[in-house]
């Protein structure tokens, strides 16, 4: 399970040093999968979590245009990225651009993945969500989640 929030940055070559607490949860893997997230962020998954994610996508109805488009958009923008000897990953430029990352980032643990957010984008998201936390919890708990 991935949890926590880490304030970090990327260098001028689009490399992100994986924080030691995050690295400790990655079980000494040598690569991760990076893909475009749903909220102007980048998702970082281990292979097992990525395989589960793909299984979920594969269960979408192939006859649905929306399902096919979602599959294309998600998987065509997914990269298997090596963790180098200095515990860094190279984030592809198109993901950097789509996530609006300049330099400062947050790495957010969200149970089955880490999300990489541009600091400004996440700060805006957080401000807009704090007032609705109790509303979201109430709605989801009523529905048994």
Swiss-Prot record:
Transmembrane segments: none
Gene Ontology MF, one: DNA-binding transcription factor activity
InterPro entries, alphabetized: MraZ, MraZ_C, MraZ_dom, MraZ_N, MraZ_sf, SpoVT-AbrB_dom, SpoVT-AbrB_sf
Localization per record: Cytoplasm, Nucleoid
Superkingdom: Bacteria
A GO CC annotation given for this chain: cytoplasm
Gene Ontology process terms (BP): negative regulation of DNA-templated transcription initiation
Similarity annotation: Belongs to the MraZ family.
Descriptive protein name: Transcriptional regulator MraZ
Gene name of the record: mraZ
